[in-house]
Amino acid sequence: IFTKKKSRLITTDPCFPMYKVYSEINQNKLIFIKYNKNFTLDLKDFYKKINNKIDAIIIANPNSPVGDLIQEKDLIKIIKKSNKYGIPFFIDQAYFEFSKTDMIQLVKKFDNVIISRTFSKGMGAAGIRLAYIIANYKIIKLFENVRPLYEINQIAVRYGLFLIKNYSLAKNYCVKTIISRDKLCKIFEKNKIIVINSKTNSI
């Protein structure tokens, strides 16, 4: 929808591996934002790399496999600059249930923000391959124009509806995971083992 052959995309390194795969398939050029030695994203470099030659930006927030989370105030600065150039800004929130953050308000503030979420992580339903996007009306219409004829099977629909109606089951699972994750991080720190305070379901 937003890219073509030789389009330039910004993402982080490391990132979700499929970003690279799909970029290669579409013959796009990926521009990577690296992490510093203390495992924090170089936000100054991120801001600097945004210009009128960039066609799209995609980040995972929280990011797996690193586990870090870009704070909303820092994210807004980057989004504002990308919006100035009309650059679509994708936020992959596959792990948002484990971060206690919600970026939906950014869709209301900026018309270039697209949020994707999945039932695979916090919902524990990777096998049904069910996900969704949150964006403004104009962007949703663009996605509707390229929807495949057979996109979601009936098993995925039924199980997805079950999980929505019984969201407390998934929420309890996420809470237990967060408690265990944070407890393990403290044990590592106590034993002087360097660890990133992850905001995903892993360390």
Question: What is each of the regions a protein language model found here?
Answer:
Residues D13, F32-K37, Q93, R117:
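Short beta->alpha connector loops at strand-helix junctions that form conserved
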Residues I1-R8:
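Phosphate-binding glycine-rich loop
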Residues K37-E97:
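Active-site phosphate-binding strand-loop segment of PLP-dependent enzymes
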Residues I196-S202:
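Short Gly/Ser/Thr- and Asp/Glu-enriched loop/turn motifs at secondary-structure junctions
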Residues N112-F188, I194-I196:
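PLP-dependent aminotransferase class I/II
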Residues N26, K84-Y85, F110, N191:
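Helix C-cap/helix->beta junction micro-motif
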